[in-house]
Curated annotation (Swiss-Prot):
Organism: Danio rerio
Superkingdom of the source species: Eukaryota
Pfam family, one: FAM176
GO biological process terms, semicolon-separated: apoptotic process; autophagy
Keyword Oxidoreductase found: no
Protein name per the record: Protein eva-1 homolog A
Keyword vocabulary terms for this entry: Apoptosis, Autophagy, Endoplasmic reticulum, Lysosome, Membrane, Transmembrane, Transmembrane helix
């Protein structure tokens, strides 16, 4: 009976603490709305940054793990059949690492344009921008003051 009363009283105090904390938060927001808004925006921004970091780490780890698993299987067969010196194998490992990084970079570039039409459209846009830049550079009016300063202009 006494334990039931203590448990009920403890539950009541926990509920009262929750209500008290909610009222304290409301009074803080009512007294200082700018500060509360600043804390809210900072919390949202921090959450977005942490989510972005988690996504970047997940994507980079996923691509690194996939590229590391494939060479391990082929690397054992290559090590058993090769009779080269240690310096040559070190050079092979570094070149293999750079080749893997290059392939990963090319793979990300390849995923940007999913179809040939998008690739062609992007190339036409780049060409158009280059032509506009050339027209802009060549179409500037000649200023008499700058011509007299440099005879090779």
């Amino acid at each position: 009976m006494v334990t039931a009363f203590l448990n009920e009283r403890q539950a009541t105090t926990e509920e009262m603490a929750l209500v008290s904390n909610a009222l304290a938060a409301y009074s803080f927001i009512a007294d200082q709305p700018e500060r509360a808004a600043l804390y809210f925006v900072c919390g949202v921004c921090l959450g977005l940054v942490l989510t972005l970091i988690a996504l970047v780490v997940q994507i980079s780890c996923r691509t690194d793990c996939k590229t590391q698993q494939a060479p391990k299987k082929t690397g054992k067969t290559v090590e058993n059949t090769s009779d080269t010196s240690d310096s040559d194998s070190d050079w092979d490992n570094t070149s293999d690492l750079s080749a893997r990084r290059h392939r990963r970079f090319e793979r990300t570039l390849g995923n940007v344009f999913t179809s040939a039409e998008e690739l062609e459209r992007a190339q036409r846009l780049e060409e158009r921008e280059r032509i506009i830049r050339e027209i802009w550079m060549n179409g500037q009016p000649d200023m008499p003051g700058t011509r007299s300063l440099n005879r090779y202009y």
